Amino acid sequence: MCAQRVTDTPEVKWQKVLYERQPFPDNYVDQRFLEELRKNIYARKYQYWAVVFESSVVIQQLCSVCVFVVIWWYMDEGLLAPQWLFGTGLASSLVGYVLFDLIDGGDGRKKSGRTRWADLKSTLVFITFTYGFSPVLKTLTESVSTDTIYAMAVFMLLGHLIFFDYGANAAIVSSTLSLNMAIFASVCLASRLPRSLHAFIMVTFAIQIFALWPMLQKKLKAYTPRSYVGVTLLFAFSAFGGLLSISAVGAILFALLLFSISCLCPYYLIHLQLFKENIHGPWDEAEIKEDLSRFLS
């Protein structure tokens, strides 16, 4: 049955109520029925370059995984001396440690209450225990086939990327799980290296690139966005160059992946905003904005 429209008379006006009898048909739709309808009043409008900037967090983690795998391949092939990697990683960690304090003027350290002596002790304890257990790490998975080790490493690195904290407030985010999966992947790959020294340095490098490096990048992003963009570009080109030295096809696919995430996906997101339709009105559920904590104590 088609809806019938009846012109309101000055004497009787239609009201949006159910508890009064009105002289209108049941299927009557007044012209003022949707006058309180609002669309997209709380919708967030994204800007293209802002989305590109935020996508750099994903780029950073993809490059970290790529660099880690490239370094492992070089060590496995005997093209990279473990002593050189350890020295370079140690020097880079010292530079990053100094920058971490200089970026915010030491405010983060004051808030956390952690001293440099405590950091030094933690570092020495970690290096000592990792070096002591490196023979165990080297022989931990000897009974497991190499194909299984590689499959486990790939699975763990994918899990690291999935559960990593990219800044989104989601239930799937778990920084602890993400880091543990990355370390487990490093242990799996380190067990296939020639010597225990290689395994020790590989696990140490994994801590540096998967635990310490994201902390520095997060602070760079918050305090010096331009420097953060420059470091991200340099890191991406380094990862691309390292992968190119191993496989040209893999490097091209990796570059296409980075381009899609940083350029095409933000453009697609901006384009989808045209189709966003969130409606609001008096039918919305009531929201209690008053602080009710005093009633719960």
UniProtKB/Swiss-Prot annotation:
GO cellular component assignments: glycosylphosphatidylinositol-N-acetylglucosaminyltransferase (GPI-GnT) complex
Subcellular location: Endoplasmic reticulum membrane
Keywords from the named record: Endoplasmic reticulum, GPI-anchor biosynthesis, Membrane, Transmembrane, Transmembrane helix
Pathway membership, UniProt: Glycolipid biosynthesis; glycosylphosphatidylinositol-anchor biosynthesis
Membrane topology: Multi-pass membrane protein
GO-annotated biological processes: GPI anchor biosynthetic process
Signal peptide range in chain numbering: none
Membrane-spanning ranges: 67-87, 88-108, 153-173, 239-259
InterPro entries linked: Plno_GlcNAc_GPI2
The protein's assembly and partners: Component of the glycosylphosphatidylinositol-N-acetylglucosaminyltransferase (GPI-GnT) complex composed at least by PIGA, PIGC, PIGH, PIGP, PIGQ, PIGY and DPM2. Interacts with PIGQ. Interacts with the heterodimer PIGA:PIGH.
Record-stated family: Belongs to the PIGC family.
Function: Part of the glycosylphosphatidylinositol-N-acetylglucosaminyltransferase (GPI-GnT) complex that catalyzes the transfer of N-acetylglucosamine from UDP-N-acetylglucosamine to phosphatidylinositol and participates in the first step of GPI biosynthesis.
Record's protein name: Phosphatidylinositol N-acetylglucosaminyltransferase subunit C
Source species of the chain: Mus musculus
Gene coding for it: Pigc
